[in-house]
Amino acid sequence: MKDLSIVFHTPEIPGNTGNAIRLAAVTGAHLHLIEPLGFDLTDAKLRRAGLDYHDLAHVTVHPSLEDAWQTLGDRRVIAFTTHAQTSFADVEYRSGDVLLFGRESTGLPDEVVADPHVDLDVRIPMLPSRRSLNLANSASIAVYEAWRQHGYPGGS
C-alpha cells in the first residue's frame, strides 16, 4: 500500500525496526523513523531482521517529529496507544493515512498523542492486565488491516 506510512517514534530495539523494514518492503508502505534511535542503522540485528529487503523498502529517518510532520504534510495521523478507547479495527483506513507508534519501553508520550497533527488514537485489543504487544507485531497488524480494507492493492 504505497500511500500508507508507518512512523516509529524513537524506537529502541533494532530487530523491531528491521522487521518493520521488511513489512514496508512487502506491503509498499513507507517507514519513517524519528530520532533519537536506540541503535545504529548498520546494527547487525536490524540487518538480520530485515533480511535482504532493505533495498526494497522506502525508509526515511527524521531528526525530530516536527520534521516528520513537515515531510508527511496534511495527512490523517492515527496514533496507536494502549490508552485509547477506539479499536484499530473500527477505523475506516484511507489512502495516505499515517500510522504512528511509540517506542518499545514506554509507547507514545502523552504530548505526542495530544499533538494537533494526530487526528485519532486507537488501540489493538488484548487481554486485560497485559502491558503491550511487540512494536513490529503491532505495526504489522495495523498495516495489514488497512491494506485488507483496500483489497490488497498491488498484492498477490
Where are these regions (language model features)?
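Post-transcriptional modification and biogenesis factors for structured RNAs
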Residues: 1-156
